[in-house]
């Protein structure tokens, strides 16, 4: 029997708004709140890729570049860029969008590694991602060394 390929390698895009309850005394978004949004997007991307449930096992090379403020829209993009037999590496980037311009300014990026599991919480095999472009090869290498 032939191994099934990935169901989708298209990115997942999540939009969220920074509300007062998501900010600190300086009205900037809590880093933990942003990490939660990014983790959720990574999980959706992994599930879209393999049609499986996933759990996060590590977050690597996460860099906070600039703050997001109360009222900003956060656009988070997650894409599977690396696989091993049971694990996906998802590159996640978050941008802040001001309401006046709706132009993205990167605020954070990193790699989220997730393991596919069955109903008993045991790891299961997944389809493999095969980089085809130079950009995909570069992201594969970055994820592998993260």
Predicted features, each with a name:
Residues 21-36:
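A conserved, well-ordered hydrophobic junction motif at loop->secondary-structure transitions
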Residues 16-17, 39:
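Amphipathic, well-packed alpha-helical segments that form the structural scaffold of globular domains
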Residues 35, 39-40, 129:
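Ubiquitous "structural anchor" signal
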Residues 3-7, 17-25, 53-61:
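Short N-terminal helix-initiation segments at or just after the protein's N-terminus
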Residues 18-19, 64, 114-116:
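Hydrophobic residues in beta-strands and at strand termini
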Residues 9, 29, 40-77, 81-83, ...:
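Hydrophobic beta-strand-centered segment that forms part of the acyl-chain substrate-binding groove
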Residues 2, 8-14, 69-70, 81-146:
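HotDog/MaoC-like acyl-thioester-processing domains
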């Amino acid at each position: 029997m032939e191994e099934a390929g990935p169901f989708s390698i298209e990115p997942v895009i999540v939009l969220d708004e920074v509300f007062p309850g998501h900010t600190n005394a300086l009205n900037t978004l809590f880093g933990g709140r942003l990490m939660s949004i990014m983790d959720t997007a990574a999980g959706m991307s992994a599930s879209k890729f393999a049609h499986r449930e996933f759990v996060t096992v590590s977050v690597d090379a996460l860099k906070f570049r600039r703050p997001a403020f109360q009222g900003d829209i956060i656009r988070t993009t997650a894409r599977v860029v690396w696989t091993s037999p049971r694990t996906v590496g998802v590159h996640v980037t978050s941008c802040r969008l001001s309401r006046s311009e709706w132009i993205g300014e990167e605020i954070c990026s990193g790699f989220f590694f997730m393991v596919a599991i069955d109903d008993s919480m045991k790891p299961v095999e997944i389809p493999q991602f095969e980089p085809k472009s130079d950009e995909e090869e570069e992201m594969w290498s970055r994820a592998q060394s993260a």
